[in-house]
From Swiss-Prot:
Name the record gives this protein: Signal peptide peptidase-like 5
Known role: Intramembrane-cleaving aspartic protease (I-CLiP) that cleaves type II membrane signal peptides in the hydrophobic plane of the membrane.
Residues the record marks as carrying a glycan: 79, 145
Regions of this protein lying in the Cytoplasmic compartment: 214-245, 297-316, 364-367, 448-459, 508-542
Posttranslational mods: Glycosylated.
Short motif (PAL): ranges: 489-491
Family classification: Belongs to the peptidase A22B family.
Entry keyword annotation includes Thylakoid: no
Gene Ontology terms: biological process: membrane protein proteolysis
Length: 542
């Protein structure tokens, strides 16, 4: 069990890695690249659909240039045009033959992008596709001192593999035509709606389980307290609840350790390191899934859940746990082996949700002070590693790690994700574990307080904290779409909503001190009530 708990905390440290993000930006507003007359386009991704000998073939993705006309966004407005190899192949000098409205396929060469485009346009080409010399895509920019940039044909850069695939087809004597367009993303994709429901539902389930466990522990404690002083001492000195309360120091240390962990991921990000993260995620996912299933099934198989068997290194384990564990292990292993398959995201989300629910049930925020410190630190952590880190690393560290840009993976596994079903660019909508888990700890605290104070849904704090969390996450997705899909730190919006709701409500109701310092309502201990001397009956007067 100690190993499982360690795995859970390892995942907890990794959970604050990524904010909500879309499947990839298609529009890049670059303020660093020079903007001069005739060279001021935004950098956009471009679909290049090919036909070989009249039959539809592969589709490639490139990036549009800073100069020239913008690529059309509608497929129906994009012309299907013949593709030809340039001669010379780099188009750094004027082509030997005139072309009549065709698109030229050229190699990167050593001359400027604008020079290639000018020679291609002068030869009568209607466009130019440049093959990059590396796998990545570069931004085709202009130099500050360039003039006479009246270029009227579009230019697109393809990565090396895609460009040479077209080059091979052309050199084999085939007839190739292409269609170039850059479709817009939908304003709202159903993936974002389902991801919002998934995140809110996870916090809801985890909060009720945490509050239910706390209520059962409290009822058991009050029952034992009534049995006498000796039992009271045993209860006070024992720690059989299995819950872990966070304090202020551990809340601060969590963010420090998470920052170190994030830097390590950024610096060491590679295929083998992602494999290690997958193993850690599977260990935590197995523990989470097993805990959730045992808790759910124990209501129907009570005898199996209350009968225990000694297992080496693990101690006493219930028969129900032994029965469920193989299924959980097989499920996690199958996901790890087949995680690149189209529907593997379902397995990842199931393991992730189970892990988050388990952590919220085990780890508790004891009062509003600790919750405020934890979420405030996470708030600045998110902002720093999404926005401020660009100044030192020239890229957003958190987004690079979350997307797995330096690996062949789709990103680190510590994410919930859903494919963007109606997005022509595909990709995933994602949310980091920390954006669910950390606010979820505060929401669970609110429900535990409500139940301990015997508050109704309307007069308590849980309903409003859930509304605040859902609203903050909703605003995150609004900001995400307004920023053209650029990754957003979700805690930037969620923390002010959730903390603000609890603090303002507590202050208005005059309960802020109890929430802040004690974390529980005033109540009289039943044992002390039992031990208080009873008032004497006055003697009867004759």
């Amino acid at each position: 069990m100690a190993a499982a708990t360690a795995a859970v905390f390892a995942l907890l440290m990794a959970s604050a890695l990524a904010g909500a993000a879309a499947g990839g930006d298609i529009v890049h507003h670059d303020d660093e690249a020079p903007k001069i007359p005739g060279c001021s386009n935004d950098f956009i991704l471009v679909k290049v659909q090919s036909w070989v000998n009249g039959k539809e073939d592969d589709e490639y993705v490139g990036v549009g240039a800073r100069f020239g006309p913008q690529i059309v966004s509608k497929e129906k407005h994009a012309n299907r045009t013949r593709l030809m190899l340039a001669d010379p192949i780099d188009c750094c000098t004027s082509p030997k033959e005139k072309v009549s409205g065709d698109i030229l396929l050229v190699q990167r060469g050593k001359c400027k992008f604008t020079k290639k485009a000018k020679f291609a346009e002068a030869a009568g080409a209607s466009g130019i596709i440049i093959i990059n010399h590396v796998h990545e895509l570069y931004k085709m920019v202009c130099e500050k001192n360039e003039t006479d940039l009246d270029i009227n044909i579009p230019a697109v850069l393809l990565p090396r593999d895609a460009g040479f695939a077209l080059h091979t087809v052309l050199t084999s004597g085939n007839s190739v035509s292409v269609q170039q367009y850059s479709p817009d993303r939908p304003v709202v994709d159903t993936a974002e709606v389902f991801l919002w429901l998934m995140a809110v539902g996870t916090v809801l389930c985890a909060s009720y389980w945490s509050a239910w466990s706390a209520r059962e522990a409290l009822c058991e404690q009050e029952k034992l307290l009534k049995d006498g002083r000796e039992v009271l001492l045993n209860v006070e000195n024992g720690s059989s609840s299995g819950m872990i309360d966070i304090n202020v120091a551990s809340a601060i240390m969590f963010v420090v350790v998470a920052s170190c962990f994030l830097i390590m991921l950024y610096k060491m990000m590679s295929s083998w390191f992602v494999e290690l993260l997958v193993v850690i995620f599977c260990v935590g996912g197995v523990e989470g899934l097993q805990t959730c299933l045992v808790a759910l099934l124990s209501r129907w198989f009570r005898a199996a859940s209350e009968s225990f068997f000694k297992v080496p290194f693990f101690g006493a384990v219930s028969y129900l746990t032994l029965a469920v564990s193989p299924f959980c292990i097989v499920f996690a292993v199958l996901w790890a082996v087949h995680r690149h398959f189209t529907y593997a995201w379902i397995g990842q989300d199931i393991l992730g949700i189970a892990l988050i629910i388990t952590v919220i049930q085990i780890v508790r925020v004891p009062n509003l002070k600790v919750g405020s410190v934890l979420l405030s630190c996470a708030f600045f952590y998110d902002i720093f590693w999404v926005f401020v880190s660009k100044r030192w690393f020239h890229e957003s560290v958190m987004i690079v790690v979350a997307r797995g840009d330096k690996t062949d993976e789709d990103g680190v596994p510590m994410l919930l994700k859903i494919p963007r079903m109606f997005d022509p660019w595909g990709g995933y909508s994602i949310i980091g574990f920390g954006d669910i888990l950390l606010p979820g700890l505060l929401v669970a605290f609110a429900l535990r307080y409500d139940w301990a104070a015997k508050k109704s849904l309307q007069t308590g704090y849980f309903l409003w904290s859930m509304v605040a969390y859902g609203s903050g996450l909703l605003i995150t997705y609004v900001a995400l779409n307004l920023m053209d899909g650029h990754g957003q730190p979700a805690l930037l919006y969620i923390v002010p909503f959730t903390l603000g709701a609890l603090i303002s409500l507590g202050w208005k109701r005059g309960e802020l001190w109890n929430l802040w310092s004690k974390g529980e309502p005033e109540r009289v201990c039943p044992h002390h009530m039992h031990m208080q001397p009873q008032p004497k009956t006055p003697p009867l007067v004759q």
